[in-house]
Amino acid sequence: MEDWTKVCQTVERVDDLPSEPRTRAGFLKYSQEITLDPNTAQRKLRLSEGNRKVTRMREDQLHPDHPDRFTDMFQVLSRESLTGRCYWEVEWRGRGVCVSVAYKSISRAGGRDAFGFNDKSWMLECFPNSYTFYHNNIESPVSGPQSSRIGVYVDHTAGILSFYSVSETMTLLHRVNTTFTEPLHAGINIYLIGNSAEFCKLR
């Protein structure tokens, strides 16, 4: 009887979790303002627009030494740590921009720091004609309408991470069901010089 009570309590807790929104208006109720942390930006990344936009540059930027800075990959993390239910959108430009979430404890160098190629990050790779999802060095092809705007929804408690193509409508590109063990941070990786990504103002 005691074990059955535990099962019932678990089911009740799962049932209590709110479902994922079904409309953009529903997602916007959980909109999260995202700013990028200059202390994590790789030296060839320039931040602008109040640290909401990141652009890959040819020359090193004047970033001071910091233990949180990515030294190899052209990556940056958000200043905000994300728990609970959050939604944000990224407008990207170019030919190779990665929209990611990661734990702050991700490595900053040494080949295991690339978003999507370790167990501490999840990445949607965006090209003009294709998407690919990566986690823990496993590649998953993604099909869906191409858009320069990607919506990201996180329900940290429920272990849900979803990526959406956003235009006049929202189309689910990829959903992850997992258990998050740390707060998450939004992340961007930019492959090519001149490419950029900007976190959109939704409020």
Regions found by a protein language model. Give the residues of each.
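Beta-rich ligand-recognition domains in immune and ubiquitin systems
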Residues: M1-R203
